C-alpha cells in the first residue's frame, strides 16, 4: 500500500513553485509526477495546492528530559517540532543526568524511541556533567548512539580540554558543537552590554565574550582538523572570524537563530524575561551582520535554540529568570513573513537554511524532496495570516518574545516516514 499526496506545490531546482503529486511507500518517496494513478489499496490525500517543503532539520533543541519534565518532555517537544514542520531535531545534553556515559545515552535513545513524534538525534556532552574538567568516553558514547558532542548551555572554558576534545572527535570524524562564552567576560550579565542595559542599569554581556571563544576554537580546529560548529552566532566580530576561517580552509560551520535575525536589543520593550536568551539580543549592527553572513554563506543555516521554561520561572524578572525562549512552532512563519515576503531572501533560500543545509552540514539523511529520499516533509499554508498565540503552543514552554506577531506560512500537516505525525485541527 502506498500513499499519494495530490496537488502539492513544491520548489524545483530553479526555485519556482510547480504543482505535482508525491507517492510514498515504505517510508520513502517513490515517485514525484503529475496526475499519479492510485491503485485500489492506495491512500490518497489531497493537499489542495498547498506548499510542500522537505521536513525541517533543527540541530539545536532543548527537550529538557530527563530531569526537567516540568519545562518540556521528549513527547511534548517533538510534538512542537512536528507542529512547526521539523521532522528531525537534535537534543541538547544539558539535562539531569547529562548523557555523559554509555548507560545514560542508551537510556535516552530508548526513551526517544518510545515517546518521540519526530526523529531525534541525541547529543552527548563533551565533558563529564558538563563541568568542563574531564572528557567523556567519546568512543563509547558514539557506539551508544551519540550524534555529536557539545556542552551547550555552557562554554568549554579550558583550551586544553577543548583541544583534546577536538582531537578525539576528529579521530571519530564527529563534530564538536560549541556554545561560545568566556565566563570571565560575562560579568554575570542578563542582556547585551548595550543601550538596553544602560537604560535599566543592568549588567551587560559584551560581544567579545562570544567572539574570543570562537577565535580560540578556530585555531584549535585548524590544529586538529576537527569539524567545529558554532552555536547561535550573535555578533559581527564572530561572523568576521568564521568568514576568515572558512576562507582559510578551516572546517568551521555556524548557525543563527530566528530571534537573532529578527530582533536586536533596541526591540526589548520592558524588563520582560521573554526577551532574555543566551547569547542575548545584540545591536542593530550585529543583527545586520548576521543577515549578511547568512546570505553570503558565512553562516550555514538556521537553528531555533528552542529552550522552554515555565511561566513561573520567566516571571522572576530579567535578572533572575533563566535564559531561553521557545522557537520550534514559530520559526518558519516568522522567517517566511519577515524575510521572504519582504524580499530579504527567496523561499528556496529559507527552505534550504531550515532543511538541506543543516542536513548537509551534519551528514543527516534528510532535508530533500526527491525520489528515494525519506518521506519526511511538511505541508504549509503560505497565505492565511494568523497571530502568534503562546496559549496555542503544544510545547510546555510559552516563553516567546513574538506573542501577537501576525504571520503567514503556517504548517498544516507534517509527515515523517510517510506517516502524518501532526495535522492542523486534529488532536489540538
Curated annotation (Swiss-Prot):
It catalyses: (S)-dihydroorotate + H2O = N-carbamoyl-L-aspartate + H(+). Binds 2 Zn(2+) ions per subunit. Its EC number is 3.5.2.3. GO terms for cellular component: cytoplasm. InterPro entries: Amidohydro-rel, DHOase, DHOase/Allantoinase_Hydrolase, Dihydroorotase_CS, Metal-dep_hydrolase_composite, Metal_Hydrolase. Zn(2+) 2 binds at residues 152, 179, 232. PROSITE patterns: DIHYDROOROTASE_1, DIHYDROOROTASE_2. GO terms for molecular function: allantoinase activity; dihydroorotase activity; zinc ion binding. Pathway: Pyrimidine metabolism; UMP biosynthesis via de novo pathway; (S)-dihydroorotate from bicarbonate: step 3/3. Its cofactor is Zn(2+). One of its GO terms (biological process) is purine nucleobase catabolic process. The active site is at 305. Keywords: Hydrolase, Metal-binding, Pyrimidine biosynthesis, Zinc. It comes from the Bacteria. Pfam families: Amidohydro_1. PANTHER family: ALLANTOINASE. NCBIfam families: PRK09357.1-2 (NF006837), pyrC_multi (TIGR00857). Catalyzes the reversible cyclization of carbamoyl aspartate to dihydroorotate. Belongs to the metallo-dependent hydrolases superfamily. DHOase family. Class I DHOase subfamily. This is Dihydroorotase. It comes from Anoxybacillus flavithermus (strain DSM 21510 / WK1). The lineage of its organism: Bacteria, Bacillati, Bacillota, Bacilli, Bacillales.
Amino acid at each position: 500500500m502506498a500513499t499519494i499526496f495530490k496537488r502539492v506545490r513544491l520548489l524545483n531546482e530553479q526555485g519556482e513553485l510547480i504543482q505535482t503529486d508525491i507517492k510514498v511507500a515504505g517510508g520513502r518517496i517513490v515517485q514525484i509526477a503529475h496526475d499519479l494513478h492510485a491503485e485500489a489499496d492506495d491512500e490518497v490525500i489531497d493537499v489542495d495546492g498547498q506548499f510542500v517543503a522537505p521536513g525541517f532539520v533543527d540541530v539545536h533543541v532543548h527537550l529538557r528530559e530527563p530531569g526537567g519534565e516540568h519545562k518540556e518532555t521528549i513527547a511534548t517537544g517533538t510534538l512542537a517540532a512536528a507542529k512547526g514542520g521539523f521532522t528531525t531535531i537534535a537534543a541538547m545534553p544539558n539535562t539531569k543526568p547529562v548523557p555523559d556515559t554509555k548507560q545514560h545515552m542508551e537510556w535516552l535513545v530508548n526513551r526517544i524511541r518510545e515517546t518521540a513524534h519526530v526523529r531525534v538525534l541525541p547529543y552527548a556532552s563533551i565533558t563529564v556533567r558538563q563541568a568542563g574538567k574531564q572528557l567523556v568516553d567519546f568512543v563509547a558514547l558514539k557506539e551508544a548512539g551519540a550524534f555529536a558532542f557539545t556542552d551547550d548551555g555552557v562554554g568549554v572554558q579550558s583550551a586544553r580540554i577543548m583541544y583534546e576534545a577536538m582531537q578525539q572527535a576528529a579521530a571519530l570524524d564527529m563534530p564538536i558543537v560549541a556554545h561560545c562564552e568566556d565566563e570571565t567576560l560575562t560579568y554575570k550579565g542578563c542582556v547585551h552590554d548595550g543601550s538596553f542595559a544602560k537604560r535599566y542599569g543592568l549588567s551587560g554581556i559584551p560581544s567579545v565574550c562570544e567572539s574570543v571563544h570562537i577565535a580560540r576554537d578556530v585555531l584549535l580546529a585548524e590544529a586538529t582538523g576537527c569539524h567545529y560548529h558554532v552555536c547561535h552566532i550573535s555578533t559581527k566580530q564572530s561572523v568576521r572570524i568564521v568568514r576568515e576561517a572558512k576562507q582559510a580552509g578551516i572546517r568551521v560551520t555556524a548557525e543563527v537563530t530566528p530571534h537573532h535575525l529578527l530582533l536586536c536589543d533596541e526591540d526589548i520593550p520592558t524588563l520582560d524575561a521573554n526577551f532574555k536568551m543566551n547569547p542575548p539580543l545584540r545591536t542593530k549592527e550585529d543583527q545586520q551582520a548576521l543577515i549578511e553572513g547568512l546570505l553570503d554563506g558565512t553562516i550555514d543555516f538556521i537553528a531555533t535554540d528552542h529552550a522552554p521554561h515555565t511561566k513561573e520561572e520567566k516571571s522572576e524578572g530579567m535578572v533572575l529568570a533563566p535564559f531561553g525562549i521557545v522557537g520550534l512552532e514559530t520559526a518558519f512563519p516568522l522567517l517566511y513573513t519577515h524575510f521572504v515576503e519582504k524580499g530579504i531572501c527567496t523561499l528556496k533560500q529559507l527552505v534550504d537554511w531550515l532543511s538541506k543545509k543543516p542536513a548537509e552540514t551534519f551528514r543527516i539523511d534528510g532535508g530533500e524532496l526527491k525520489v528515494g529520499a525519506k518521506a519526511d516533509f511538511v505541508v504549509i499554508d503560505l497565505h492565511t495570516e494568523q497571530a502568534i498565540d503562546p496559549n496555542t503552543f503544544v510545547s510546555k514552554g510559552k516563553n516567546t518574545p513574538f506573542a501577537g506577531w501576525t504571520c503567514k506560512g503556517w504548517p498544516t500537516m507534517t509527515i515523517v516516514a510517510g506517516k502524518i505525525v501532526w495535522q492542523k485541527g486534529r488532536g489540538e
